[in-house]
């Protein structure tokens, strides 16, 4: 009896579950961890990079991408599903610009993606998208935005959030450490994102993909060397803090 609801996308189980949507959410939990942090004048995206094969080109393995000049997205889950969503979102951004002669707002394109995902939970012959996304950018008012969508088609605005395999651990870290002082400068916001990922990434900066977006500026991707410099700086700060603690205890 239960298997009937298990296989059907558009049929609720007697206790109110859409199992295929829940399975899509499980697919997200198996994806790489991604974190987004809204700073004062910046939005930071960081993603845990999985190890790349020796002969593979790293540039083809990206979990952060631009949707328009002022909007970008990071995702966790199935890369092939994400590619479809990204292409549809990019077309919508260009179509909106041609139609109304204004760029999309961050909330508009987030709502478009969420609506697309919701349609795939309610029609036969399709399955839900197995991705969650962090969508960030700036509107004309210059205020940084951060939204998160999930496979069910819901979306919410956040100050900071994480998705993917270790999202719970990273979110708990952000709840403890996200303060006005922690995002007072662009540099501090970047370091907070890296610190959050280092909670679950064991091999340091080489396995972190990092990007920032500022108002009226395109998406900036950080090189592995740049990320490593930040990691080194964070480690030095930790060592100094530990030394101060040990001196106080003595």
UniProtKB/Swiss-Prot annotation:
Tell me which positions the record assigns to the signal sequence: none
Top-rank lineage group of the source organism: Eukaryota
Task: Cite the entry's keywords alphabetically.
Answer: Cytoplasm, Glycoprotein, Nucleus, Proteasome
The residues that carry sugar chains are 132
One of the GO BP terms on file: ubiquitin-dependent protein catabolic process
Keyword Ion transport on this protein? Answer: no
Subcellular location(s) of the protein: Cytoplasm; Nucleus
Q: Which Pfam families match?
A: Proteasome, Proteasome_A_N
Q: Which SMART domains match?
A: Proteasome_A_N
Family named by the database record: Belongs to the peptidase T1A family.
Write out the function statement from the record: Component of the 20S core proteasome complex involved in the proteolytic degradation of most intracellular proteins. This complex plays numerous essential roles within the cell by associating with different regulatory particles. Associated with two 19S regulatory particles, forms the 26S proteasome and thus participates in the ATP-dependent degradation of ubiquitinated proteins.
What NCBIfam families does the annotation carry?
PRK03996.1 (NF003075)
Q: How does it assemble?
A: The 26S proteasome consists of a 20S proteasome core and two 19S regulatory subunits. The 20S proteasome core is a barrel-shaped complex made of 28 subunits that are arranged in four stacked rings. The two outer rings are each formed by seven alpha subunits, and the two inner rings are formed by seven beta subunits. The proteolytic activity is exerted by three beta-subunits PSMB5, PSMB6 and PSMB7. PSMA7 interacts directly with the PSMG1-PSMG2 heterodimer which promotes 20S proteasome assembly. Interacts with HIF1A. Interacts with RAB7A. Interacts with PRKN. Interacts with ABL1 and ABL2.
The protein's name in its UniProt record: Proteasome subunit alpha type-7-like
